[in-house]
């Protein structure tokens, strides 16, 4: 036993040397790994093997990065592009950054609806699936074979039998679809793929990199993107969670092209195939007479561990820094890195009304403890923090100055910014932003406000626990 522990300790020393001198991570993450590998050697060893290897990360994504670049050039020939030099807008710098970081096209001929509950969203999804004539492309983190999951699978299977192209891509960890349901879909002519499959569901050396996207695209006429996964719990049927509060979008118009491009790249990678299909049918002609008459500026921005730039984080950062009057944020998990935390503090210190809403009852208790460790710094700067008490808050939204907002799959945490595959829509429109604000203030009615006075009264044990877990927060 002593020999085993000594071997683990020596291997951990090699890991630490690699982290410091080869991987050259940021100081926060480096210290977190040093602490856990030194003081919890066996646990640290296991966690590092599963979650920590940047060298393995580079190996995993080297082919994907090269393939995506090649395929992206091909996809661009089918997408609508605008000359950004001619755009004169309040947020031109953000638009330019998103374009340069993620090749994200700025489009205006869009119509966007917001959904704040799963009942209406799932009804709309099924209705649109039933109207499909050419193709249905679906990419989700969690997909369950429960009541609502089976309804959607039945709708997909029915369309596949009718000759509609059906492609369903799910994450290997989030997938809970029964094999018999998958077999029915395949027998009907549908196609099903798992993103980053492992030896078995929970033995996967790539477990750290999750496809957290929630995308549905139908005939390039309509698309859905947001925070809802597929399962009964999102309808509030899980008694342990209760009401599920989330935000999702329904998109019509040219913004769908970038979302379709994102799906095709992910599908191609999971399928280990080239884009050797007729792509014209997947993209909207920018000169089509069927485009929405509304003018709603939008960009689809995606990020993941296969990129050196943290695109969605950078977009959030620009929105925070641009805010002049108010900034309203909803996120289920709050683990900002130091630059993001400082940006929020500086916004509050500058007189911006910064309101951050988090779950009062986190689904993972330790994530609540980590979030708590950032409260004092924000409260001292003048930011306001609210805990949502009516069930579970899962929305991932940010709104600034009633003029710009972002909705999608990315939480405001280090994992979403650097380790998960995420997609958000950035919306440059006052009407949509005000609708988001209205919902934020509705949610405030069922929130408890965290005050500095009440927060300082927490127990010594809570303070010690928060301080300890804060040390490893960069790994969460």
Curated annotation (Swiss-Prot):
Domain PLD phosphodiesterase intervals: 207-234, 389-416
Active-site residues, as the UniProt record annotates them: 212, 214, 219, 394, 396, 401
GO molecular function, one term: cardiolipin synthase activity
Alphabetical UniProt keywords: Cell membrane, Lipid biosynthesis, Lipid metabolism, Membrane, Phospholipid biosynthesis, Phospholipid metabolism, Repeat, Transferase, Transmembrane, Transmembrane helix
Transmembrane parts of this sequence: 2-22, 31-51
UniProt keyword annotation of Lipid metabolism present: yes
A GO cellular-component term linked to this record: plasma membrane
Topological category with respect to the lipid bilayer: Multi-pass membrane protein
Subcellular location per the Swiss-Prot or TrEMBL entry: Cell membrane
EC numbers on record: 2.7.8.-
Free-text function comment from the UniProt entry: Catalyzes the reversible phosphatidyl group transfer from one phosphatidylglycerol molecule to another to form cardiolipin (CL) (diphosphatidylglycerol) and glycerol.
NCBIfam families, per database record: bac_cardiolipin
Protein name (record): Cardiolipin synthase
Organism: Clostridium perfringens (strain ATCC 13124 / DSM 756 / JCM 1290 / NCIMB 6125 / NCTC 8237 / Type A)
Gene for this chain: cls
